[in-house]
Curated annotation (Swiss-Prot):
It comes from Homo sapiens (Human). May play a role in the organization of actin filament arrays within muscle cells. The lineage of its organism: Eukaryota, Metazoa, Chordata, Craniata, Vertebrata. Pfam families: DUF4749, LIM, PDZ. This is PDZ and LIM domain protein 3. Keywords: Cytoplasm, LIM domain, Metal-binding, Phosphoprotein, Zinc. Interacts with ACTN2. Forms a heterodimer with PDLIM4 (via LIM domain).
Amino acid sequence: MPQTVILPGPAPWGFRLSGGIDFNQPLVITRITPGSKAAAANLCPGDVILAIDGFGTESMTHADAQDRIKAAAHQLCLKIDRGETHLWSPQVSEDGKAHPFKINLESEPQDGNYFEHKHNIRPKPFVIPGRSSGCSTPSGIDCGSGRSTPSSVSTVSTICPGDLKVAAKLAPNIPLEMELPGVKIVHAQFNTPMQLYSDDNIMETLQGQVSTALGETPLMSEPTASVPPESDVYRMLHDNRNEPTQPRQSGSFRVLQGMVDDGSDDRPAGTRSVRAPVTKVHGGSGGAQRMPLCDKCGSGIVGAVVKARDKYRHPECFVCADCNLNLKQKGYFFIEGELYCETHARARTKPPEGYDTVTLYPKA
């Protein structure tokens, strides 16, 4: 029904429009921003705008409607049309009269006939082909109601457990309720489209319960053989099972057994002597595994090592023999098997008279 909504200015208003005469659709509110002025005015998505500030929207385009809304500075007056909504309300009446202290919160019952099911929703009486209605049941059991009659309760001894089994097979969709002395047995076999449960097992359980309640020994039917004894497969399996089987031996074992039985040392043709591979054991005193010894102090070197002319030294032992200057990352000279810096090397190698000493460095 049409109603008028006034939004106080200024913008933004907090709603989104869609439609217009250019879209061949009415102007409809599609979105409301939470906490906005439109939400405070109780505007809802789906409201149809009939007029904006007194101007009808029948001939307005979408852009014209936006311009009308933007032109509203102090307030925006919208005339909207909102569809009716049906809300569920609880039943507060009982027998046509309102009950002040009792509220029934149960919803209205719905008819389930519009659902399509391959199987029965509600159990229906079983009808044997060739008969109009009803079913053949043992005495004292009502197939239509699924409950034993009062006369059957008084004459419990006349009920045979086998008859119950027959009745349950004739009417599988009808629950059977039997009241016996001191016990009440309810048999409700529902539809099983996938054959999840064996009908024979269910019937045997029902017959055993009734027989136990009546104080009788339950008579169970003998299980039928799944494989007929006359089949060829059945006879073949049982014939092989009855015959004693001899132990089987591998081909290599039979060859060795034949050699032992003959007692000859001659090897059969096509065989040769094969020795097992011998694993070589590496010695622990290999050259690569030996610890290098320092050329100066004579102790083993563990960690960083300095090598000069196939001689190993500790980094702290790699010094000049005269001034103990560390020669690492510097030039060094070997004179008579000793290390010297450049200064002391020049002092130890005096050239003949008339010659000067010139230092030559090896090319990298």
